[in-house]
């Protein structure tokens, strides 16, 4: 097994262990109450999983996209809901790619530590505006 595969196996195992603390009843209760899984997102943040893509210089792990994919895949595999946290992992990429040095220094360490949650982004499509469920496309 190569080093990258070993690292990803360790990540997968660690995510599975964390997810075991959030059984089906936790998710069913949140679903009934239409509530946000704050405890789950906090646990992922504190474990460093949601800052996987943030460079080390800003307090993240600086891992490759493949590691982030493994994290999200394992969350779903374990029966947890990655929808509540995937934006925290990926939206910061906009700041990383397009932010100036001051913005990166101001926001990325706070996102990495969990002090700031950046989980929103705007979408607009020519045929449906912001209603992505009405999007039409052809292959």
Predicted regions and their residues:
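Intrinsic disorder at enzyme termini
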Residues: 1-11
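Glycine-rich flavin
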Residues: 24-139
